[in-house]
């Protein structure tokens, strides 16, 4: 099955008996094999439908394959790149493949849902924020324990040239 967040189709093995050869979406060659795959409204040699990351032949795996950002992915690589689900960590709603997202510690958010837990202001790329136990805080509303050093800090990716607290992140 192919999951494209906004639409689904199945990967189907089709017999090519008696029909003119189809062009493979992977290699462009004619498919003269007895069986071919039909996925994402295109035909594929069984050897050509591959994960864009690990090159696993998806016709052989017999499980789901996913497409996002122009890539065809096996389940493991989809989860590695885009998180466990295509759902927003804040609202639980699905996130369309074409939509921009915000990420924090492996969690994925709609842009509109990436807000401070205290003041509810939306954080935008470039804003500094604190991510404490799965909760987002803006710079102004960070928990007072962070100021006093009482909360365990999370690791962060420091912004070049700017000093940051251990739990501080940059969108």
UniProtKB/Swiss-Prot annotation:
Gene3D superfamilies hit by this protein: Cysteine Rich Protein (2.10.110.10)
One GO BP: cell differentiation
Residue stretches making up the LIM zinc-binding domain: 22-84, 86-148
Keyword terms, alphabetized: Developmental protein, Differentiation, Gastrulation, LIM domain, Metal-binding, Neurogenesis, Repeat, Transcription, Transcription regulation, Zinc
GO molecular function: metal ion binding; transcription coregulator activity
Tissues of expression: At the start of gastrulation (stage 10), expressed in the mesodermal marginal zone. Shortly after (stage 11), expression is down-regulated in the dorsal most region. During neurulation, expressed in the neural plate and ventral epidermis. At late neurula stages, also expressed more rostrally, and then in the brain, migrating neural crests and ventral epidermis.
Amino acid composition bias (Polar residues), ranges on this chain: 1-19
Triggers of expression: By irx1 in the neural plate. By bmp4-signaling in the ventral mesoderm. Down-regulated in the dorsal mesoderm at stage 11 by Spemann Organizer repressors including gsc.
Record keyword Zinc-finger present: no
Entries under InterPro entries matching the protein: LMO_RBTN_TF (IPR050945), Znf_LIM (IPR001781)
Region (Disordered): 1-21
General function of this protein: Acts as a positive cofactor of GATA transcription factors to establish the identity of the ventral mesoderm during gastrulation. Down-regulation in the dorsal mesoderm is necessary for the proper formation of this territory since, when present, lmo4 may bind ldb1 and restrict the availability of this cofactor for Spemman organizer transcription factors. At neurula stages, suppresses primary neuron differentiation and modulates gene expression at the Isthmic Organizer of the midbrain-hindbrain boundary.
Protein name from the UniProt record: LIM domain transcription factor LMO4-A
């Amino acid at each position: 099955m192919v999951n494209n967040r906004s639409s689904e189709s199945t990967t189907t093995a089709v017999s090519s008996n008696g029909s003119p050869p189809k062009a493979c979406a992977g290699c462009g060659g004619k498919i003269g094999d007895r069986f071919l795959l039909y996925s994402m409204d295109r035909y594929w040699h069984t050897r050509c439908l591959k994960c864009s990351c690990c090159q696993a032949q998806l016709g052989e795996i017999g499980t789901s394959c996913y497409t996002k950002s122009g890539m065809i992915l096996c389940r493991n690589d989809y989860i590695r790149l885009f998180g466990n689900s295509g759902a927003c960590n804040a609202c639980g709603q699905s996130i369309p493949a074409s939509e921009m997202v915000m990420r924090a510690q492996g969690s994925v958010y709609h842009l509109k849902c990436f807000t401070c837990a205290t003041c509810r202001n939306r954080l935008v790329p470039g804003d500094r924020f604190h991510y404490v136990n799965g909760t987002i805080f803006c710079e102004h509303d960070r928990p007072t324990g962070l100021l006093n050093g009482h909360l365990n800090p999370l690791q962060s990716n420091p912004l070049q040239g700017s000093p940051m607290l251990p739990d501080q992140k940059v969108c």
